[in-house]
Regions:
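Class I S-adenosyl-L-methionine-dependent methyltransferase catalytic core
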Residues: 1-191
Length: 191
């Protein structure tokens, strides 16, 4: 597990011991950031269920301006990885359950260009987080919410403001869905 490119290219990331964290593979991360492309530089990033911090740190390495990492149990690992990658200055690390943190943000002023949501699979957490981002209006216009979930977790909750614009499956193991605000899609001329 490493940072693929940017200012911290090649930096190895430390993972917590045990199987409670399932980091996004380098292959999936490379594919994801290839799709995101020009959205990353100068972006404000929220990395939910951050684990090692790999997604947010990759975004910082590629030029994102600031990243908030939220995880109840791995804040120390994230801090260590951010320090090792020399990206700590632009990182804010929150030791809190991601769903509770989203509840705290809802209705507030804070919004993000890019939100990563990569919770443990098969626990219903991605659906809860998706609905909270949707109802809490946490995504800036033109921003993207990226959700990684189990490949067999197909059912989408009802959404008001967000629409799935892309889905990529990685076998039966995992899938990534990308969401944008419906109003931003209409303004851009997308269906």
């Amino acid at each position: 597990m490493r940072i693929i490119t940017g200012t911290a290219k090649g930096c190895r990331l430390k993972a917590p011991k045990g199987m409670s964290t399932r980091p996004t593979s380098d292959r999936i991360k490379e594919s994801l950031f290839s799709i995101l492309g020009s959205l990353v530089p100068d972006a404000s990033v929220l990395d939910l269920f951050a684990g090692t911090g790999g997604l947010g740190l990759e975004a910082l390495s590629r030029g994102a301006s600031h990243a908030v990492f939220v995880d109840a149990s791995t804040a120390d690992i994230i801090r260590e990885n951010a320090e090792h990658a020399r990206l700590l200055e632009n990182a804010e690390i929150v030791r809190r359950e991601a769903i509770a943190f989203l509840g705290h943000l809802a209705g507030g002023e804070r919004r993000f260009d890019l939100i990563f949501c990569d919770p443990p699979y098969h626990k219903g957490l991605w659906e809860k987080a998706l609905v909270m981002v949707d109802r809490g209006d946490l995504l800036l216009p033109g921003g993207v919410l990226v959700v990684e979930h189990g490949g067999d977790e197909r059912r989408l909750p009802e959404l008001r403001a967000l629409e799935c614009v892309r889905e990529v499956s990685y076998g039966h193991t995992s899938a990534i869905r990308m969401f944008r605000k419906k109003e931003a899609l209409k303004e851009a001329g997308s269906p």
